[in-house]
Amino acid sequence: MFHVKHSHYDVVVVGGGHAGTEAAHASARMGVRTALVTLRRDGIGVMSCNPAIGGLGKGHLVREIDALDGVMGRVADLAGIQFRLLNRRKGPAVQGPRAQADRSIYRKEMLRATEAQSNLDIIEGEVVDFLMESPTRVRGIILDDQSEIRAECVVLTSGTFLNGVIHIGNKSSSGGRMGDRPSIKLAERLKSFELPLGRLKTGTPPRLDGRTINWDILDSQPGDEDPTLFSFLSTNTSAPQIACGITHTNEKTHEIIRDNLELSAMYGGHIEGVGPRYCPSIEDKIVRFADKTSHQIFLEPEGVNDHTVYPNGISTSLPEDVQVDYVRSIVGLENAEVLQPGYAIEYDYVDPRALRSTLELRDVEGLYLAGQINGTTGYEEAAAQGLVAGLNAASHRLKQQEIVFGRSNSYIGVMIDDLITNGVTEPYRMFTSRAEFRLSLRADNADQRLTPIGYDLGCISEVRRSEFDRKMDAITRTKSALTSVLLTPKQLLEAGIQVNQDGNKRNGLDVLAFPKVEFDDILPLFPELADTETSIREQVTRDSLYANYIARQEKEVASLKRDEQYRIPRDFSYEIDGLSMELRQKLERSRPESLAQAARIDGMTPAALALMLGSLKKLSRGESKAS
């Protein structure tokens, strides 16, 4: 254990989960001395729930984290034992990379990467309090042994540990997750800041012994033959690849669950927190979708050398004996042994409207929050917030400009804006449908959107910079060659490409945007591109496919950026004549940072925005005269 009675760092990150590790790495990459404080060193990078990374919307976040040199994507590629590109039959904008991960490899590789990161120390201990310079300025942390660590900024990533309570049937026990104690004293300290707090819940299914599953009678789901990896630096899979199994609940399963609903912690009245809408418990599915006779279950091995299987789709808070009964009513699981019961966990969260776009608390300077404490669910959402908080905490220490991600340049920006503008009434999960500019926010172009920003911030390694420059040079050369020649309809027809014989000349990029035209189809017309590597061909094809749509979208993006330029001072008064009391209250609670953010508050009207704009312009003119 790294331990000193008194020490000083630039940034301290509390918690070694997905938000904490990403925050610590981001801060350290910025060149500031960073400490990652966690209960146990070997708990860094633990996958508390499902053994998977990515998915629809989530995969976009992982790619964006990687584009800024974050660690989640690289570690997921090392630990991935099955890779699948979701929505493969749809357009690239909504396709989502996903990987089944080996829990053990993921944890070991995340710990290895964290130990190897320069400017970063790992400290074991429980944080019980903050060091305060004033009632509204954090200056470090206090551990349970009363040792102190001073810091310019603190990033809190407590996950489900704040006043965490585990529920199995009518039995409840304190815990941050199964086998770990909760954080009680720190939760009490947060209450003293008079922050808007609430309770949320999440759940996990029983873990099964794969040796007791009848795999032979189940459908098999293999991974993709040509895996789509997360990191722009990865080239191949590292771990052995496996298949998952598929089974379904049935009427007997549903009958067992219905007969025991009152024994469920959720339906028995033991849980007050709201659970995730898009990851409901099996009890919730049976009640909400009463007309369905079966629900799909994915049997996901937790590792290549681990017999544990994660049955994705049957999370529960029913008593353990009922769990065994309903599991064994399912085809292929008739003799399955339950290694660990499923459970629900309830925990404190902070209303994210109390945060700024940097994820620093509005009313407590130097304290940043990231992950489930902000009302989100999912490893990827947590890691993306950790990245934002870590970068901004380091920038605060370096006295650099705040780092704000916009809705027009990243899913990270969409998520942060959603959280701090509208708050949450249930655990927030990322989907591609949340992004209005999703045609340009594709998983495949995350590096083109964000890696240059990483250059400017100083959080990108030379290896990544060199690889990105090489890739962009190749893309630029290829596009230049394709646009250098105008082709007649006759030339295209002679090359086997069907187009309207309208006399209009088109360049190679225009032709690539046609349906069913592949890069190989235009090579007879551009023989100098025959040696273009596959990844560059695919990227240029995707870029050409969306070029016209994105050009039309630019007007909307320009309008959004114009409104984002109207910054709202922290002490701005909403006592504006003509502004309704309801909107005043919502604006006071959310305290938007720009006119664009104010426009997205529920109930906002064009007339109210015009009143605010007039007041902001008047304020700006007054400041100009004063100076």
From Swiss-Prot:
Annotated Gene Ontology cellular component terms: cytosol
Cofactors named for this entry: FAD
Family affiliation: Belongs to the MnmG family.
Gene Ontology MF: a single term: flavin adenine dinucleotide binding
Keywords (A to Z) from UniProt: Cytoplasm, FAD, Flavoprotein, NAD, tRNA processing
Protein name, entry field: tRNA uridine 5-carboxymethylaminomethyl modification enzyme MnmG
Job description of the protein: NAD-binding protein involved in the addition of a carboxymethylaminomethyl (cmnm) group at the wobble position (U34) of certain tRNAs, forming tRNA-cmnm(5)s(2)U34.
Main localisation: cytoplasm
InterPro entries given in the database record: FAD/NAD-bd_sf, GIDA_C_N, MnmG, MnmG-rel, MnmG-rel_CS, MnmG_C, MnmG_C_subdom, MnmG_C_subdom_sf
Matches recorded under SUPFAM superfamilies: FAD/NAD(P)-binding domain
Entry annotated with the keyword Cell cycle: no
Domain of life: Bacteria
Organism: Ruegeria sp. (strain TM1040) (Silicibacter sp.)
A UniProt-annotated Pfam family: GIDA_C_1st
Subunit text: Homodimer. Heterotetramer of two MnmE and two MnmG subunits.
Keyword Cytoplasm tagged: yes
Binding site for NAD(+): 275-289
Leader sequence segment: none
Binding site residues for FAD: G15, G16, G17, H18, A19, G20, V127, S183, Q372
Compartment annotation: Cytoplasm
GO biological process, one term: tRNA wobble uridine modification
